[in-house]
Amino acid sequence: MRVIASSIRKGNVLEQDGKLYVVLSAENIHPGKGTPVSQIEMRRISDGVKVSERYKTTDQVEKATIEERNYTFLYEDGEGFHFMEPESFDQVQVTKDVVGNSAPYLAENMVVKLSMHDTTAVAITLPQRATLEVVETEPVTKGQTASSSYKPAILSNGVRTAVPPHVGVGTRVVVLTEDGSYVERAKD
């Protein structure tokens, strides 16, 4: 489907010269003189090459049709990440380029949304929050309840984050999968 360049947003998938590109960032620039343009940073899905394009805001570009479906994460091996569609039990393999920074948060049997173009996965959406265990941090310091300072910690998936002073090793915490930031102590 053809759309004007100014309507392209991060996460959209474009089709150019028979190849698919996922939009990393899109910015509309309105100079004082001259024609407004859309500056678009994209990554080619087939090989991960980053491309920067500049279009007039009124130019037409081809937006690929994408279908979002729930998949269950099975396992990771040297070839990539393997997911299963729960209703048909069809398995799909997703490359490391598509999974990107989401890889540490993937847990066995986790339900994620895969954006599919035909039979190719082009993007992954994790649940907003993940519950993980703190495996390394400074010892709990008594009497530091008034300050809002955070201390560094390493979680069970290897991600570094900052936690409040009262959180110790072995504590289960809830973090945002988008950036790994601490939300709260787990209630389990």
Curated annotation (Swiss-Prot):
Location of the protein in the cell: Cytoplasm
Keyword match S-adenosyl-L-methionine: no
Pfam families assigned: EFP, EFP_N, Elong-fact-P_C
GO molecular function annotations of the record: translation elongation factor activity
GO CC terms, sorted: cytoplasm
Gene Ontology terms: biological process: peptide biosynthetic process
Transmembrane parts of this sequence: none
Predominant cellular place of this UniProt entry's protein: cytoplasm
Keyword entries, A-Z: Cytoplasm, Elongation factor, Protein biosynthesis
Pathway: Protein biosynthesis; polypeptide chain elongation
NCBIfam families recorded: efp (TIGR00038), PRK00529.1 (NF001810)
Function: Involved in peptide bond synthesis. Stimulates efficient translation and peptide-bond synthesis on native or reconstituted 70S ribosomes in vitro. Probably functions indirectly by altering the affinity of the ribosome for aminoacyl-tRNA, thus increasing their reactivity as acceptors for peptidyl transferase.
Family per record: Belongs to the elongation factor P family.
Protein name: Elongation factor P
Gene: efp
